[in-house]
Every structure is written in structure tokens, then in C-alpha cells.
Amino acid sequence: SGASFLYAGVTPQTPLYVHTLSVNSYIQSAYRLTKGGSQITDLLIRELQRYGAHLYRQTEVVAFSYGSEQQITAVHTKQGQTFRATHIISAIDVKQLLQIAGKQAFKPSFYKRVQGLQPTASAFSLHLVLKPNIFPYLPYNIYWFKDNDSVYNTAQYATNDFPLSYMLSMNPPKDSREYTDNVTILTYMNANELQRWQNSFTTNTEGNPRGNQYEVFKQQRAMDLLDVVAQQFPTLKSAIAHYYTSTPLTYRDYIGNPTGALYGYKKNANHIMESVFMPQTHIKNLYVTGQSVAMHGLVGVTISAVLTYQILMRSSGFL
């Protein structure tokens, strides 16, 4: 399937349900949002605040306190805050959760299963800001693959054979005109290419720049990707006003998973239960949700959130 980029499919492993849920959401709903997807985040924040929720940005959980019966009584942050609660829901990467909670809090078999999870591929993303009234708006996504073998194996490439695929998309024009002012191009990138910067960390608020060699690497990969895209869209290069890039390290530092994986962990049709997790954990009042324990994407995390909510309400006696 050309749409395998939506879930980083692997030929002998990926279950059919992953393909079905990923593609079906595009068939039954809008595949693009006027004014961008951040509207969903803004709406969720407003609704949460309307119901009295407090949201804390740039707040990293680093430890739990335990009371009787191995229940969590408090959550401690890197910023020095302590939050006390009777129920804890974690949406962070499940491997990171185990680091925070401690190995001793879980059964050895569960801990081993989590540590054995294999991440999906990560990506190199190229975000273009275009000059006005030059590049026509395309009301559809472009999925390009170098050959048939690349459809399910594009994350495995020789260093001099990059990229093997890409997805090209754009936001609808704000003024409803026929030209776009933005293009986003995604391609798989092997995290091993960034091994020399593995110990670095940088976000808008923390860390330090990764240095000139990293910038040169990103620029070279951006040009490699543009050269391939220009074979199909020869006018695109001349329409670029400026651009910025993201690598697997960018995704790692912002999303918080070990490799910057786009879609959580691989699902294996031959061992389907290895990557399936129920919301309950061995810690009585700790629940998990999100793409690292269920399906990825807006559909996947919504299904996971509803399931976690149902389990929490049932265990609390409300259902």
C-alpha cells in the first residue's frame, strides 16, 4: 500500500488492523484541516480548563512516591514540584515510564516484554515556506516510492541511496486561492545516521545546539530530498523562500521516546499480544494510554484514551 507511510509498515510483520485503522480515518473524515491541526490541541485545552483542569507546560516527571500496597501517592518533577493524586494516568513512552516507576514495581515478565519492544521508523521532515503565488495548491497528498521493494522497506537504505520514499503534503491556502505558501515533505530516516549526536539534547527551552556538523548534515539531507522531489515537481526549488528541518533527534527530544519513532512500537501479526497492553498496570493506581501501548495517530490515541477512561471509571466504582 502506498499509504504505508501512515504507519511505517513492515512486510512480514504489520497486522492488517493497523493498515485498516490508519487508512479508514482518511476515508471517513477530513484528511486536512483548514488553519492546521493545532486547532484540535487548542480546543482540548479550552475544554479541559472549562472543567477545572490545570495544565503545566515544560514540566518533566522524574519520580514517584509510594505508600501502602505499592500505590503511588505523589508525582515529583524535575522543576521541584510535587503533585499528590489518587489515580495516575501516563501517556508518555512506556519504556520511560518504567524508568521513572522503577523495575521493582513490575513483574519481571512484563518488564522484559516492554524492554523487548522494537520502535517503528523515525523520519526526516522538511518544512518549506514558499514565495507567494508560485506553487499550485494540491488538494491531495503525494506518496512516492523509488520502486516496489521500497514500499515496506524504506527505513533500510544505503547512506548514498537516500531517500527511498517521501510523503508530500500542504495546508489549505488561508485565502482560498489556488497557490500554497507551505509544503511539508517527510521521509524515513535511520536513527543510526545520527549516532555521533546521540548524547545531545536540545529543545526550544532546554539543551544546547548540536553544532555546525549537525547543521551541515541536515542541509545535505534536505538537498538530497529536494533533488528527488524536484524530479516530479521541477518548479518547487525556485519557489522556496526558506525552510527548516527535523531529524529523529528532534522527534526524540520533543516526543520523549528513545529513538524518535513516529508511531510508537512495531506491531507483529505473528506475535500480536507482545505489543498490546491493557490500561491497568501492576501498580494499582497507575494507568497507561497513548501510542506506545496502543495504536498511533489521532484515531489510535483517542481509542486508547476512551478505553483507559472506562477502566478507570470501572475500578473507581463509577461504572
Regions found by a protein language model. Name each.
Residues 1-51, 58, 254-269:
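Active-site/ligand-binding neighborhood in enzyme catalytic cores
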